[in-house]
UniProtKB/Swiss-Prot annotation:
It is found in: Cell outer membrane. The keyword Transmembrane applies. Induction: Unlike E.coli, constitutively expressed at low and high osmolarity (0.3M NaCl) (at protein level). Expression is under the control of OmpR-EnvZ two-component system; still expressed at very low levels in high osmolarity in the absence of ompR-envZ (at protein elevel). InterPro entries: Gram-neg_bact_OMP, Gram_neg_porin_domain, Porin_dom_sf, Porin_gammaproteobac, Porin_Gram-ve, Porin_Gram-ve_CS. This is Outer membrane porin C 2. One of its GO terms (molecular function) is porin activity. Belongs to the Gram-negative porin family. Forms pores that allow passive diffusion of small molecules across the outer membrane. Plays a role in virulence. It comes from Shigella flexneri serotype 5a (strain M90T). Transmembrane segments: none annotated. One of its GO terms (cellular component) is pore complex. The gene is ompC2.
Length: 366
């Protein structure tokens, strides 16, 4: 019984981010799963900064241990290895994606700490389903609690204390991260920094239909406030996010959409932070029985009050792609990002990409 409970709980806690896993150990109330993938990937685009080989490998483990009848401990680690570097620079770009541990106490929920997904991604993940691109208008790495980031203490409650199936909520605290870097003008890589903050999210999923909302608020760092000396950067003392989303996932159909607004948070171009951004993402996919999964999406993020450029589109594109699954372990895909932003004085000044990109890849995963 202990083994069964641990297996079910750990799978439930971590399955949202892990498609497959190989069981390594399962004995005496302890369970350890190993998972990974290798993706041979290439981008084709006129922009030489993005064109070329993007091959990578990913490895992770997730585990749990039965402490007593009411309490289970769990941990999760994931690492990304770049496969396109020469051997003299083999570790360049490698990174820890996830590293956290915590406890789950019966129907009262779970509490963990470490590098994890921010509660904003509870909504952002619903549209981050494209073969290669997508999920990038407001879900950004190490940007407050919108995506993967560090210093997160997260409480999650599933099925509302076991009373309402499908109703989940979370509360999150993020500690201050200065990201000190003397090579930057303002003494830090301020686009990836954050002050103390909190976030809450709630989702309800029933019979394939889902609806959810999230709110976060954080202090901004001194470096971020100093960066406001450039009028292209945000000047507020707090960073805030409001987002809502819907999804449908049943009968081989997948559809999801979200809308969000951020204040003094969303990054754009080559190291700028917008005063205000409004973003919209929508994706539709269909899974054929013979393995083909076509995908169509539209994404847009508009920045407000961007210095002398006023209001501007920071991201806007249509994405057309398809994935073919040979089996549960092997797949191949193509993804075409049709950029709808035209080159202008604004895009040149802040270095926003305007070219289309085609990505082709083949993936083995376990």
């Amino acid at each position: 019984m202990k083994l069964k409970i641990v297996a079910v709980v750990v799978t439930g806690l971590l399955a949202a981010n892990v498609a497959h896993a190989a069981e390594v150990y399962n004995k005496d109330g302890n369970k350890l799963d190993l998972y990974g993938k290798v993706t041979a990937l290439r981008y084709f685009t006129d922009d030489k900064r993005d064109d070329g080989d993007k091959t990578y490998a990913r490895l992770g483990f997730k585990g749990g241990t039965q402490i007593n009848d009411q309490m289970i401990g769990f941990g999760h680690w994931e690492y990304d290895f770049k496969g396109y570097n020469d051997e003299a620079n083999g570790s360049r770009g490698n990174k820890t994606r996830l590293a956290y541990a915590g406890l789950k106490i019966s129907e009262f929920g779970s509490l963990d700490y470490g590098r994890n997904y921010g509660v904003g991604y509870d909504i952002g993940s619903w549209t981050d389903m494209l073969p290669e691109f997508g999920g990038d208008t407001w879900s950004q790495k190490d940007v407050f609690m919108t995506y993967r980031t560090t210093g997160l203490a997260t409480y999650r409650n599933y099925d509302f204390f076991g009373l309402i199936e499908g109703l989940n909520f979370a509360a999150q605290y993020q500690g201050k991260n200065e990201r000190t870097d003397n090579s930057h003008l303002y003494g830090a890589d301020y686009t990836r920094a954050n002050g103390d903050g909190f976030g809450i999210s709630s989702t309800y999923v029933y019979d394939g239909f889902g609806i959810g909302a999230v709110y976060t608020k954080s202090d901004r760092t001194n470096a971020q406030e100093r960066a406001a000396a450039n009028p292209l950067n945000a000047s507020g003392k707090n960073a805030e996010l409001w987002a809502t989303g819907i999804k449908y996932d049943a009968n081989n159909i997948y559809f999801a959409a979200n809308y969000d607004e951020t204040l003094n948070m969303t990054t754009y171009g080559d190291g700028y932070i917008s005063n205000k951004a409004q973003s919209f993402e929508v994706v539709a996919q269909y899974q054929f029985d013979f393995g083909l999964r076509p995908s169509l999406a539209y994404l847009k993020s508009k920045g407000r009050d961007l210095g002398r450029y006023a209001d501007q589109d920071m991201i806007e594109y249509i994405d057309v792609g398809a994935t073919y699954f040979f089996n549960k372990n092997m797949s191949t895909y193509v993804d075409y990002k049709i950029n709808l932003i035209d080159e202008s004085d604004f895009t040149r000044a802040v270095d926003i990409r305007t070219d289309n990109i085609v990505a082709t890849g083949i993936t083995y995963q376990f």
